[in-house]
Amino acid sequence: MRKAIATISFLGLGLALFAVACYAQQDKSKRPSPPAQATFELGGGQSVTVDYSSPRAKGRKIYGDVVPLGKVWRTGANEATTFVTTADITVGGSAVPPGSYTIFTIPDKDKWTLIISKKTGEWGTDYPGTSSDLARVDMKVSSLPTPVENFTISFDKSATGGTMNIDWESTRASVAIGKK
């Protein structure tokens, strides 16, 4: 009897470990909110790269419903959004040294706040708190002419640097980025 219980326990443990290994190796591109990346070339081999998961609107009201207004949001889906710069830059006027960061936002009707957190490896909305903030900057909010189904982060280049844009539903939040 003890041998049977030991065998069943061993098989159960083996099955659990197999399931965890399979889950860890799943194809992230098949998720409902697949991974996406935006890169801004600063010149001289230096860049800013944002890795995020791109949820879909699917007919839902996004801001004020799926994404609450006035509260910290993970800015995408799944793992927290990463922001990596290989150069000294400014984001919304705040200095950001080379490194890897997590970004969060606080969406609101007329103004968003971009939070650049020194703590990385977060999952979802696990905002580590203001003690981990490198910077908090205001983002300009505007309306898009046509709704955007897939949450998107992109960069526009300008004569003085560029702009990071966050587009979803009918809203664009943007912030200036420049090389220091």
List where the protein language model places each region.
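Bacterial N-terminal signal peptides
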Residues: 9-19
